[in-house]
Amino acid sequence: MTNSNNGNGGTNAAASGWLGFSLSPHMASSTMDEHHHVHHHQQQQQQQQQQQHHQQQQHGLFFPSVTTAAAAAAYGLAGDVVAATNGYYSQLASMPLKSDGSLCIMEALRRTDQDHHGPKLEDFLGAAQPAMALSLDNTSSFYYGGGGAAAAGHGQHGYLQACDLYGGPAAPSLVTAADEEAAAAAAAMASWVAARGAATAYATGAADANAAENVLPSATAAQHLHHPLALSMSSGSLSSCITAGEYGMAAVAAADGGRKRGGAGGGGQKQPVHHRKSIDTFGQRTSQYRGVTRHRWTGRYEAHLWDNSCKKEGQTRKGRQGGYDMEEKAARAYDLAALKYWGPSTHINFPLEDYQEELEEMKNMTRQEYVAHLRRKSSGFSRGASMYRGVTRHHQHGRWQARIGRVSGNKDLYLGTFSTQEEAAEAYDVAAIKFRGLNAVTNFDITRYDVDKIMASNTLLPADLARRNAATTTSKDDHSAAGAGAIVSVHSAADIAVADTLWKATTAPRQQQQHHDDVVLSGADQAAFSVLHDLVAVDAAAAHQQQQQQQHMSMSAASSLVTSLSNSREGSPDRGGGLSMLFAKPSPAVAASAQQQASTKLMAAPLPLGSWVSSPPASARPPAVSIAHMPLFAAWTDA
C-alpha cells in the first residue's frame, strides 16, 4: 500500500489540474519494484480501506483520506462536491504552489461555518498524521496539468478514506468520484513517463516508490505513532531539516545517504583549488645586489638608500640615487652612498678596495652633496632620461619638465616645461632654495643663485632673475660702455682741432724754413699718433694726406676705445681704473723711449715731396709730443 501512495497522490493532482509537489524524501529504488507493489495493492485496495476506516472510528484518530475530490472541495473548485461534503476539507497530499514556490492559501479555504476557524499551517504540518518528510527537490516534485483516459487499478493506492478533519466519515459519493478521477490521473501519469523517457522515469519513479515505503508506516502502526512532520528543503545536494522528530530525521538521512552514494562517482572527488596569481608579482622587482630594485614597468634599475635622518626632513620614503640601465652600476651607486652615510664598516656589494678613489673624493663633500653628485652621474631615472635632479622628459612632445616633491602636503609641485634640461634644472634649483633654504640639494652650485633674493620673494623667481648679480653686472657694463662712447664721440672733433693748433704753435717761430717745417709738422703729427697706435691698436692710413689721416685716426681711436671699455669690466670710470690707468703720464724713461721710437718712424716714413728733400738732423727737429701732454685726455682723467 505504501509504495504507491505518492505516485497516486501526484496523479490525482494532475487530474484536477492543480500544481503540486510530492510529500516524499529522495530515495532510490527500481521501477520493477514499483510495478510489483502497485499490482499487489490493487488486489487489497477495498479491504484495506474498510479496515482503516474501522480503526479510525474506534480509536478516534483521524488520518483523513487525501483525495483529489476532497482537495477540490476544500479549495472550491467543484461546487457539487463541496455541497455534498458540506465544505469539508482534508489534509492535502498535493498542495497548491505559486510561481515562486510558496504555498497558495486562498480565501476559499475558509469554512462557511462561523464556529470553525480556517485552515492554518499547523493543519498541514500538524501531529495528527504519521511523520512525513516534505521535500522541495526537483527530482521528486511533479507538476501536472490536464487529465487523461481512465485506467483501472490506481484509484485509491496510498490514500486513506476521506473523512472530516474534525470527525465523521465523508459521503460515499466522494469515494466513487475519487476512484474515477484517480484512474484518469493514472493514465496521464503513464503518458508523462513515456514522454520523459526511460531514464527519467527510472530515477523519478524509484525515488518516489522507496520514499513512500520508508517514510509512511502502515495504518495499524500509525495508530500508535505520533511524530511531527519532517520538513526538508533540498537543493539537490544537501537537505536542511527545519523541524523533525526521530523518525523524520532517520528518513531524511536515509534519503540523503542514498543520493550521496549514488552521486559519489561524479561529485565525491574534491576539486583542487587554484589560487589566483597576486598582482604584486607583475614584473620582478628583485635584484641580486643590496639596495637595488628593478622598476616594474620600465625595467631600469634603481639604487635606494634608506637613512633615518631623512625622517626629520619629512621624507617618508627611500632616497633614490638615480636610475641605471645596468644592475651593477646601480649596485655601485648604492655602495658609494652607503659608505658616505655609514662608513667603511657597512655591508656593501663589492669589495672596499674598489672604492679607494671615491673614498678620497667623498671626504670633501657632505652627505647631501655627495648623494647629489651620485645622482648627476646616473643615466637618468625611471620616469625620465635627464641626469638632473627634479627634471623629467615628457613622453609625448619630448620637452623637459621640472617638478619638486614634498613641498605642499607631501605632493609634487609642477614648475613648468622647458626646451632644455639645464633650464628645467635651474627652475628646480630655485624652487629647492625657496622651500628648503641653504641646505637644499641643487643641480648647480648654490653660489650661482642669489639666495637672499629668492628667499625674500613671495613667488618663485625665474631662473634668469634668480642668478647672483647677473642683471646688475650686465646693466653696469652697458652703462659704462655707452658713456665712454658718448665722451669719445663728443670730443673727437675737439681732439683734432687742439692737436692741429698745438703743432702749428710749435712750428710758428721758424718761418724761414716754411717748406721744411711743413714736412716736419707732417712727420711729427704722424709720430705722435703712432704712439697712440701702439697703445690702442689703431691702424693709421697713408701719411702723405694729413687731413685724411687725422680724420681716420680720430674715428679709429673712438672705436677702439669703446671696444676696449666694453670688453673689460675694469674699464668703467666708477671702478677707479680704465682710462686713468691707460693714459697716465709716463715715466721719463718711457717718454724718452717713445720719442726715440717716434723719431725712428719719422725717419723711416716715406715723404710725399720726393727724394730731393733731405731729412734734417735730429737736433733740428722739434721733439714729439707725448700723449700724456694732451689736454683733452688729461681733463677727462681728472674728471
Curated annotation (Swiss-Prot):
Disruption phenotype: Strong reduction of adventitious (crown) root formation. Induction: Induced by auxin. GO terms for molecular function: DNA binding; DNA-binding transcription factor activity. Residues 25-59, 258-277, 547-579 are annotated as: Disordered. Residues 43-59, 547-561 have a biased composition (Low complexity). It is found in: Nucleus. Pfam families: AP2. PANTHER family: AP2-LIKE ETHYLENE-RESPONSIVE TRANSCRIPTION FACTOR, AP2-LIKE ETHYLENE-RESPONSIVE TRANSCRIPTION FACTOR CRL5. Belongs to the AP2/ERF transcription factor family. AP2 subfamily. This is AP2-like ethylene-responsive transcription factor CRL5. It comes from Oryza sativa subsp. japonica (Rice).
